[in-house]
């Protein structure tokens, strides 16, 4: 995912501000949401190819949040009035440079870095059987990794913290822990 961050879209984009139960309280510009650390919604999409490999990328160095870090999810902030599902499809299509992707919702959790950022994270999975043309503003480099390769890279590469947490929860969810 591209990690939801202050730089992942226009700061004047209007998003839903939500409460601890993920209920909409009001709308606000993204700049206000980040400035005041308001709880909001984000989507994460784990994209696999037909061989089960996972789209993994390095964020551009121009990103304000986790520049140059790696991620095994694509995604971003949910717009005001937008459903999690619609946002997951929109973000996956934008970041991968594709059309017609279908995502499957898996689980939701509240991410917090313990300091400043906090958001509801809706995790989806998708399979893509075709070429990708990743968005140059978001993706500096990409590859497709097996789960074993990804788990190995998690110990040697810098990964975005929310993507790391979403991957941990994904593995737990899948094994029923």
Predicted regions and their residues:
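Nudix hydrolase/Nudix homology domain
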Residues: 28-31, 80, 107-177
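Active-site segment of metal-dependent pyrophosphate-handling enzymes
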Residues: 37, 41, 61, 83-85, ...
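Conserved hydrophobic "DFG−1" position in protein kinase catalytic cores
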Residues: 17, 47, 56, 125-126, ...
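A short, polar/proline- and glycine-enriched secondary-structure boundary/capping micro-motif
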Residues: 36-38, 65-69, 145-146
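A glycine-rich, hydrophobic loop/mini-helix early in the fold
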Residues: 42-76
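Short, surface-exposed loop/turn motifs that are enriched in glycine and acidic residues
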Residues: 76-82
């Amino acid at each position: 995912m591209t990690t939801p961050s202050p730089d992942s879209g226009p700061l004047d984009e209007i998003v839903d501000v939500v409460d601890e139960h993920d209920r909409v309280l009001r709308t606000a510009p993204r700049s206000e949401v980040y400035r005041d650390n308001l709880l909001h919604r984000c989507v994460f999409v784990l994209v696999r190819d037909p061989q089960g490999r996972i789209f993994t990328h390095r964020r551009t160095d121009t990103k304000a949040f986790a520049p140059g870090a790696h991620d095994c999810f694509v995604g971003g902030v949910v717009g005001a009035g937008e459903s999690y599902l619609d946002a997951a499809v929109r973000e996956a299509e934008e970041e991968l440079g594709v059309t017609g992707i279908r995502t499957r919702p898996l689980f939701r959790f509240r991410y917090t870095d313990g300091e400043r950022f906090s958001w509801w994270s809706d995790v989806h999975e998708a399979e893509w059987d075709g070429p990708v043309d990743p968005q140059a503003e978001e993706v500096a480099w990409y590859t497709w990794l097996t789960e074993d390769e990804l788990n190995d890279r998690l110990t040697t590469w810098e990964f975005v913290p929310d993507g790391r947490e979403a991957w941990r929860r994904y593995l737990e969810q899948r094994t029923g822990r």
